[in-house]
């Protein structure tokens, strides 16, 4: 199992339901609204600090 990492939201499009996170080290990671934990409307804001686990997706690594 991968370790939890920290990063910052680069951008997130509420209408499309996806965006990118810039980890503390390594390349930017794709993030989809279904991967966001919590109740209610799932969104992220630019500049928001987040923690995540990187996993292999269909097109590469994602949060």
UniProtKB/Swiss-Prot annotation:
Affects cell viability at low temperatures. Its main location: cytoplasm. Residues 7-63 form the CSD domain. Gene3D superfamilies: Nucleic acid-binding proteins (2.40.50.140). GO terms for cellular component: cytosol. Induction: In response to low temperature. PANTHER family: COLD SHOCK DOMAIN CONTAINING PROTEINS (PTHR11544). InterPro entries: Cold_shock_CspA (IPR012156), Cold_shock_domain (IPR050181), CSD (IPR011129), CSD_CS (IPR019844), CSP_DNA-bd (IPR002059), NA-bd_OB-fold (IPR012340). It comes from the Bacteria. This is Temperature acclimation protein B. Keywords: Activator, Cytoplasm, DNA-binding, Stress response, Transcription, Transcription regulation. GO terms for molecular function: DNA binding. It is found in: Cytoplasm.
């Amino acid at each position: 199992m991968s370790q939890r990492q920290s990063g910052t939201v680069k951008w997130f499009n509420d209408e499309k339901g996806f965006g990118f996170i810039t980890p503390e080290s390594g390349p930017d990671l794709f993030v989809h609204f279904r991967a966001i934990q919590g109740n209610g409307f799932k969104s992220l804001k630019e500049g928001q600090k987040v923690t995540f686990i990187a996993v292999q997706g269909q097109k590469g690594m994602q949060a």
